[in-house]
């Protein structure tokens, strides 16, 4: 701490000195000269490094006077100045390996400041390496395992030694202790690092020597030489190259004739020098007559021979049995067992349980005493010699203690989860002839420890939950079992911390820590995510607690919560309806347009079907159930109205199903000139001024009364003429001549409908001028038609163009519909305050304006029956490309229903047949005459 404070003070003094020099303009000289020294590492503190006063050209006494001191940064000061001798000395022990690791050159740099000159001198001290480190292995012992039958020449890698020194002082060589089986080979890597390998020179014999002890020595090249060692233990694995050998070639035993069945007579033992399965010996009888085979039982694993039937001395007093021993590799050995049957004995042993230590914990070490037994037999000599035994499958064994006491000790590890208590039977048998025995029974309880973690019934779980579920709803239940008891088996459930789309999992799911029931904390949305992955942890309450995890996959099921969305025709913001063009010559099945819709749901909830919900002319059009294609169901007739209104419904297959509707307007005409001609055939009131309205009404009533008869005659003549021309047109095949094929809508799906042109006809409420709007193209949203034309081409109607006229019923004039009037913002020209939409353009020359005025004013008288249906809007009319450029479906204002004739009760309806509940008369875009007008 003191050194740190000194360095901090020196740093502050130096910083202040530098600032002072800068303030007074004193020049700062640095790096004028570099002074170099070289010292070996591990010098003692105060060792001489160099004469700094001499190298600086100063006397030793001037060092203090001139304020000469060492300036260093960020490192513990390794050197200091001796002001009396003027020499540079070490400030402490210098360890090159600590400073520079194994770098080839180790240099310590710092500066010396002469304060009165404000001058810095660079000092560079090279620390040279000495051989102060011996090579060292990471471990003191190394185990190498080699199979007994490995061929000579096999190589085995050995660990490398580490020497932090460099150059000749670093690791140079390896040596192996002398032996007759192995040699050492030293290899070098690409970076020059040497590593040793153990090479087998001669074959091994595990039975001769199972473990070979070798010493590997690593040496450096320093002076003095240093080295490090590691003990290498080579364990030889066994191969089956030895046959079993009995401990005795012949076994003899004498037994009383009254021995009980199951009494063990003797145990034969054969040994095999091999290990593992090669050394496991099994026993069997060989060449034993059937009569003798029933008398004895041989344990094939232990070699124990027991009585399986009562012996009879009078029947047979001697048995000669041949036993065969076989190892796992089919090597055999045989031995003889000679059994002599004898007589005598009358007292049974007495067995007493002196002490019982119950319960015993299941983690008790082997050899723990659980009971102390005392045995006694009143007989003498051999008949009074008592032996105790227990069943072989029990994890206990009996050990003889002093005098006649036995200890029952743990022989194999206990597991309370497998057996929680043992009913132990101890049998005491004397050595009489026949032997007598006594049994003692007692119960030993095993106490539990927390040695088993909770286990789930499945490796992983998955469950399903419908979306839009109620908050707090139960989702699923997981169950874990712990075979321990009491608090060691009390399970606590929890969820592992995780995030879903940046939100903690705990905000979506919670779990009951006692029951394992999972609850939804919020309503899930299938469209947000389909699946949740989580980890459930089950921990017991033991000390220390144990736990286990299981993965749970929660799948969100889709519900029909999204209605279909209409993509085409798109609904514009101004409330207009798209208009499609169907030529009069269209055959049945002609593709008029296509309704395109999508559903955000999935599966069956997203399957869409289309149907025609409503049509102004039933039976004229049909909608594809699965494609949404609107096609003609029959050939178009002359009586079919110019404007057809269709309502198409799109419905999904969810439960309950959701639907959406779209209204389509179809103009029945062959081309734009024909549509405009039909519009031009309407007549409009001659005057909209209201100042002389009363006079005009009187004149109008008188005029109507006078010309009524003449009108009827002219109308009949005109109808006859139209009927005559209609017959001529039908005879000519109804073909359209002189019109390019590119002037019609394509039938290749939605793309064709997007490559059409729309037109607007707007009538103002305050002006008698009519305008034909040619919307500007929106090249960002639409496709460009291959056939284009000039937007400013004049639109002309031939004077001699004549159209057949259908019978037009006389309908009473309906009052105006107030909600069809234009707002002030929608009125074009000088009548309105502004244009309602900047996507359309008004006529830009006097000719266009006057022509359209004349056409619309001429048709005003026919507006009352609502059959004038020419309109535009957000959809397309599918008209010829020569009358306007391509434009976006959604960006065209819709004025087709917003028609109001000033000074008149005449209005235009939105769809044919919607006005006053009467069906309109229409046909082939023909000119129509209005009926008799009503007075206000």
UniProtKB/Swiss-Prot annotation:
Region (Disordered): 806-845, 906-936
Glycosylation sites: 51, 423, 549
Impact reported for residue 275 to K: Found in a patient with intellectual disability; uncertain significance
UniProt keyword annotations, A-Z: Calcium, Cell adhesion, Cell membrane, Glycoprotein, Membrane, Repeat, Signal, Transmembrane, Transmembrane helix
Boundaries of every Cadherin domain copy: 33-137, 138-246, 247-351, 352-456, 457-566, 574-687
Biological process per Gene Ontology, one example term: homophilic cell adhesion via plasma membrane adhesion molecules
Basic residues compositional bias, start-end: 926-936
PROSITE patterns: CADHERIN_1 (PS00232), CADHERIN_2 (PS50268)
Cellular compartment(s): Cell membrane
Entry function: Potential calcium-dependent cell-adhesion protein. May be involved in the establishment and maintenance of specific neuronal connections in the brain.
Protein name: Protocadherin gamma-A10
Source organism: Homo sapiens (Human)
């Amino acid at each position: 701490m003191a050194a740190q404070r000194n360095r901090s003070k020196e740093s502050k003094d130096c910083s202040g000195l530098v600032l002072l020099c800068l303030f007074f303009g004193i020049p700062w000289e640095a790096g004028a000269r570099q002074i170099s020294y070289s010292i070996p590492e591990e010098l003692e503190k105060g060792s001489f490094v160099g004469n700094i006063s001499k190298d600086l050209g100063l006397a030793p006494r001037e060092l203090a006077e001139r304020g000469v001191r060492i300036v260093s940064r960020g490192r513990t000061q390794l050197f200091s100045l001796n002001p009396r001798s003027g020499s540079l000395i070490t400030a402490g022990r210098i360890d090159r390996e600590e400073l520079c690791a194994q770098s080839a050159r180790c240099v310590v740099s710092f500066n010396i400041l002469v304060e009165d000159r404000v001058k810095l001198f660079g000092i560079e001290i090279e620390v040279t390496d000495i051989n102060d480190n011996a090579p060292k292995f990471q471990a003191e012992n190394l185990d190498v395992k080699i199979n007994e039958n490995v061929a000579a020449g096999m190589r085995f890698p050995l660990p490398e030694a580490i020497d932090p020194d460099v150059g000749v002082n670093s690791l140079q060589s390896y040596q192996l202790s002398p032996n007759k089986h192995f040699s050492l080979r030293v290899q070098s890597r690409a970076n020059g690092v040497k590593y040793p390998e153990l090479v087998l020179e001669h074959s091994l014999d595990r039975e001769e020597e199972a473990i070979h002890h070798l010493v590997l020595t690593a040496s450096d090249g320093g002076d003095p030489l240093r080295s490090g060692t590691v003990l290498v233990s080579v364990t030889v694995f066994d191969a089956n190259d030895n046959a079993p050998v009995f401990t005795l070639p012949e076994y003899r035993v004498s037994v009383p004739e009254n021995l009980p069945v199951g009494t063990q007579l003797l145990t034969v033992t054969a040994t095999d020098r091999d290990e593992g399965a090669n050394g496991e010996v099994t026993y069997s009888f060989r060449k034993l007559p059937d009569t003798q085979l029933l008398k004895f039982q041989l344990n094939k694993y232990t070699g124990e021979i027991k009585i399986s039937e009562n012996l009879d001395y009078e029947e047979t007093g001697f048995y000669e049995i041949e036993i065969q021993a076989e190892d796992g590799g089919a090597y055999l050995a045989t031995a003889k067992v000679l059994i002599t049957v004898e007589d005598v004995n009358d007292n049974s042993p007495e067995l007493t349980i002196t002490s019982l230590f119950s319960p015993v914990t299941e983690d008790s070490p082997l050899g723990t005493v659980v009971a102390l037994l005392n045995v006694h037999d009143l007989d003498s000599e051999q008949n009074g010699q008592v032996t105790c035994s227990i069943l072989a499958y029990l994890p206990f064994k009996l050990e003889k203690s002093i005098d006649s006491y036995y200890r029952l000790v743990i022989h194999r590890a206990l597991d309370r989860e497998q057996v929680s208590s043992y009913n132990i039977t101890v049998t005491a048998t004397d050595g009489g002839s026949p032997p007598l025995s006594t049994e003692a029974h007692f119960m030993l309880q095993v106490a539990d420890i927390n040695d088993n973690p909770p286990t789930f019934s499945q490796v992983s779980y998955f469950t399903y939950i419908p979306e839009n579920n109620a908050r707090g709803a139960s989702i699923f239940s997981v169950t874990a079992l712990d075979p321990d008891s009491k608090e060691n088996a009390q399970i606590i459930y929890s969820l592992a911390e995780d995030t879903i789309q940046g939100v903690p999992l705990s905000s979506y799911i919670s779990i009951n820590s006692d029951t394992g029931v999972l609850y939804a904390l919020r309503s899930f949305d299938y469209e947000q995510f389909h699946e949740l992955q989580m980890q459930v942890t089950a921990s017991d309450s033991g000390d220390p607690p144990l736990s286990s995890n299981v993965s749970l996959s929660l799948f969100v099921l889709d519900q029909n919560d999204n209605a279909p969305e209409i993509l085409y025709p798109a609904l514009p913001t101004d409330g207009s309806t798209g208009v499609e063009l169907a030529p009069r010559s269209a055959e049945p099945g002609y593709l008029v347009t296509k309704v395109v819709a999508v559903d955000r749901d999935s599966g069956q909830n997203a399957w869409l079907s289309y149907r025609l919900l409503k049509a102004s002319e039933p039976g004229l059009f049909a909608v594809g159930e699965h494609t949404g294609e609107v096609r003609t169901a029959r050939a178009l007739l002359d009586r079919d109205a110019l404007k057809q209104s269709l309502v198409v419904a799109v419905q999904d297959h969810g439960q309950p199903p959701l639907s959406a509707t779209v209204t389509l307007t179809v103009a029945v005409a062959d081309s734009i000139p024909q549509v405009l001609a039909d519009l031009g055939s309407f007549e409009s009131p001659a005057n909209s001024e209201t100042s002389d309205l009363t006079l005009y009404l009187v004149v109008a009533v008188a005029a109507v009364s006078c010309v009524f008869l003449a009108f009827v005659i002219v109308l009949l003549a005109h109808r006859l003429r139209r009927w005559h021309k209609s017959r001529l047109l039908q005879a000519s095949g109804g073909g359209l001549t002189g019109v390019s094929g590119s002037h019609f809508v394509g039938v290749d799906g939605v793309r064709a409908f997007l490559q059409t042109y729309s037109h607007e006809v707007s009538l103002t409420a305050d002006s008698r001028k009519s305008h034909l709007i040619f919307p500007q193209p929106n090249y960002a949203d639409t496709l460009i038609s291959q056939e284009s034309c000039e937007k400013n081409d004049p639109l002309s109607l031939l004077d001699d163009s004549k159209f057949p006229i259908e019978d037009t019923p006389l309908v009473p004039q309906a009052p105006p519909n107030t909600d069809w009037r234009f707002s002030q913002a929608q009125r074009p020209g000088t009548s309105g305050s502004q244009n309602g939409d900047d996507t359309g353009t008004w006529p830009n020359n006097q000719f266009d304006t006057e022509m359209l005025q004349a056409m619309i004013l001429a048709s005003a008288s026919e507006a009352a029956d609502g059959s004038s249906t020419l309109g535009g809007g957000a959809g397309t009319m599918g008209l010829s490309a020569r009358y306007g450029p391509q434009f976006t479906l959604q960006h065209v204002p819709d004025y087709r229903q917003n028609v109001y004739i000033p000074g008149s009760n005449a209005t235009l309806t939105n769809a044919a047949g919607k006005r006053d509940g009467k069906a309109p008369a229409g046909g082939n875009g023909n000119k129509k005459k209005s009926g008799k007008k009503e007075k206000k």
